[in-house]
């Protein structure tokens, strides 16, 4: 399951390897971008094209996995509208692979064969609205429909019990696409072409099989194994829909950096997937997205303006053929935008084509690291500031929290948030309230605690005042040495469950501008206040 940003006001969680999140990278500001107006999220019906409509929905078959007991009956709170079934009857769950807003992904072993798979366990507490439940069923339907195709994760089946919907699928043990590129330490146009070819192949397969993806981004691609020549696999179809011939789509969904201009204008078709793939190619070649700003509004403005930078480094050293393909994929007019089939035949992209084997500037890898990892430390620092902020500074927010937390439990539930927003005069739909809930719920436990609420609602300039930044710095600087060492950073990040060893080292490397192996106060403040591709988080209210 995932989020769209029909109107997203909240603090977003970082994308993690193997998780179930599909968050918008940055949230909506208090002003809406031009050329579009917020509206309630609408969900396309999971109708299959062609004669397939005469068959039972694939998700029914997926839910009715081998071993289903004929004595079990469908429960009233069923999401899949089928009998409950314990996934542990067929699979042994192992270690946690990733955690996201909607649940946890585990390594699992099939009891009958001993084969390893991934099990994405999605908490039913997170599936609150009718739209959530429809989306869940549609995601299963689409995954089963596409399963078995190259570069698309193989889907095994869906199992629902009282607490969760469990999706069992192919284990992609090679990790995230960008992690592999960064770890190699060197990179060529030919390597970028190989990656892009597989991503566009996913687009071609989806469109051929009647599916519009709508959320192509690097985080949604994993590597099938740790092998050097491992296939890239698309793993997330939570925002995908079946294409209806002649239908004009109007939902604003996706992730900010990768959204096509026609999505913002609420009139689009399958061409949006080519645009998103073009954004990924631009990042592969340069290390940064072509459109970014301090706010989501700024990103949208840049997308609608349409200026693409081919002058800054490393573009002067990138081949003209590569730039030609990027331009064709990022053509603003969807009618003139290149098709998936034509992308695959482009001289630069096709196998054995013009893409050079000459290494791309190492700065590109550095930028990719920043693009992927920087926000984790910023987010943790903001949480630390919120935990230690003076009570008098947040008296109003404290009262607001108490008013919304009607049962005095110390946490805000979905229902409490919905009622609280209504009292404040909000006219958000249930789906939009749910998005706010997911955005502010940093630890993913289904409710917003006091610190999460303060972090999401305080004005950012107050959180980032000199006094508060210094308090946060002191929190990390445990030995009061005036520096945050790698050990202190590792301890802090792991305390909050954020980041593996590789990410910790990447964060230190990105922030440590004088390369002395530690972070001083000036470097810390510069990191907190600088504009970078992982943007600052907006307010909940």
Swiss-Prot record:
Gene3D superfamilies: EF-hand (1.10.238.10), Phosphorylase Kinase, domain 1 (3.30.200.20), Transferase(Phosphotransferase) domain 1 (1.10.510.10). A lipid is attached at residue 2 (N-myristoyl glycine). Its EC number is 2.7.11.1. It is a lipid-anchor. Keywords: ATP-binding, Calcium, Cell membrane, Kinase, Lipoprotein, Membrane, Metal-binding, Myristate, Nucleotide-binding, Phosphoprotein, Repeat, Serine/threonine-protein kinase, Transferase. It catalyses: L-seryl-[protein] + ATP = O-phospho-L-seryl-[protein] + ADP + H(+); L-threonyl-[protein] + ATP = O-phospho-L-threonyl-[protein] + ADP + H(+). The modification Phosphoserine is found at residues 69, 255. Ca(2+) 3 binds at residues 477, 479, 481, 483, 488. Residues 355-385 are annotated as: Autoinhibitory domain. The active site is at 215 (proton acceptor). Transmembrane segments: none annotated. GO terms for cellular component: cytosol; plasma membrane. Ca(2+) 2 binds at residues 441, 443, 445, 447, 452. Residues 14-54 have a biased composition (Polar residues). May play a role in signal transduction pathways that involve calcium as a second messenger. Belongs to the protein kinase superfamily. Ser/Thr protein kinase family. CDPK subfamily. This is Calcium-dependent protein kinase 9. It comes from Arabidopsis thaliana.
């Amino acid at each position: 399951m995932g989020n769209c940003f029909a109107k997203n006001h909240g603090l977003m969680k970082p994308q993690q390897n193997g998780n179930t999140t599909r968050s918008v990278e940055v949230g909506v500001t208090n002003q809406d971008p031009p050329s579009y107006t917020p509206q309630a999220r609408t969900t396309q019906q999971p109708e299959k094209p062609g004669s397939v409509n005469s068959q039972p929905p694939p998700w029914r078959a997926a839910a009715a996995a081998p071993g289903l007991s004929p004595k079990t009956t469908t429960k009233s709170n069923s999401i899949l509208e089928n009998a409950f079934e314990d996934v542990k009857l067929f699979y042994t769950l192992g270690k946690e692979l990733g955690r996201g807003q909607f649940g946890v992904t585990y390594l699992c072993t099939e009891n009958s064969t001993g084969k390893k798979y991934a099990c994405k366990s999605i908490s039913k507490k997170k599936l609150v609205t009718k739209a959530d439940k429809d989306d869940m069923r549609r995601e299963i339907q689409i995954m089963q429909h596409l399963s078995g195709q190259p570069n698309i994760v193989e889907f095994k089946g869906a199992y629902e019990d009282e607490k969760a919907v469990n999706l069992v699928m192919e284990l992609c043990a090679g990790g995230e696409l960008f992690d592999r590129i960064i770890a190699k330490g060197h990179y060529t146009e030919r390597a970028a072409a190989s990656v892009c070819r597989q991503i566009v192949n996913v687009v071609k397969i989806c469109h051929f099989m009647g599916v519009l993806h709508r959320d192509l981004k690097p985080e949604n691609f994993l590597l099938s194994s740790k092998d050097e020549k491992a296939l890239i696999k698309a793993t997330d179809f939570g925002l995908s829909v079946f294409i209806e011939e002649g239908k004009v789509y109007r939902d604003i969904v996706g992730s900010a950096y990768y959204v096509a201009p026609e999505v913002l204008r609420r009139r689009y078709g399958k061409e949006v997937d080519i645009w998103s793939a073009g954004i990924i190619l631009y990042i592969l070649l340069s290390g940064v997205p072509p459109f970014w700003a301090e706010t989501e509004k700024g990103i949208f403005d840049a997308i609608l303006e349409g200026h693409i930078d081919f002058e800054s480094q490393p573009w002067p050293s990138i081949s003209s053929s590569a730039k030609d393909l990027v331009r064709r994929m990022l053509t603003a007019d969807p009618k003139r935008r290149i098709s998936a089939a034509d992308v695959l035949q482009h001289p630069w992209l096709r196998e054995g084509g013009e893409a050079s084997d000459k290494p791309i500037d190492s700065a590109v890898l550095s930028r990719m690291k920043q693009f992927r990892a920087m926000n984790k430390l910023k987010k943790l620092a903001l949480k630390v500031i919120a935990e230690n902020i003076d009570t008098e500074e947040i008296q109003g927010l404290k009262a607001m929290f108490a008013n919304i937390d009607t049962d005095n439990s110390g946490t805000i539930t979905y229902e409490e948030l919905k009622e609280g927003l209504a009292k404040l005069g909000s006219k958000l739909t249930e789906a939009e309230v749910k998005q706010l809930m997911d955005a502010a719920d940093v630890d993913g436990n289904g409710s917003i605690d006091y610190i999460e609420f303060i972090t999401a609602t305080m004005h950012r300039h107050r959180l980032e005042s000199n006094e508060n930044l210094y308090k946060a710095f002191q929190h990390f600087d445990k030995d009061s040495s005036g520096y945050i060492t790698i050990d202190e950073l590792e301890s802090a990040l792991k305390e909050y469950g954020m980041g593996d060893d590789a990410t910790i080292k990447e964060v230190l490397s990105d922030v440590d501008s004088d390369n002395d192996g530690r972070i001083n106060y000036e470097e810390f403040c510069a990191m907190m206040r600088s504009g970078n591709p992982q943007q600052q988080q907006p307010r909940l209210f």
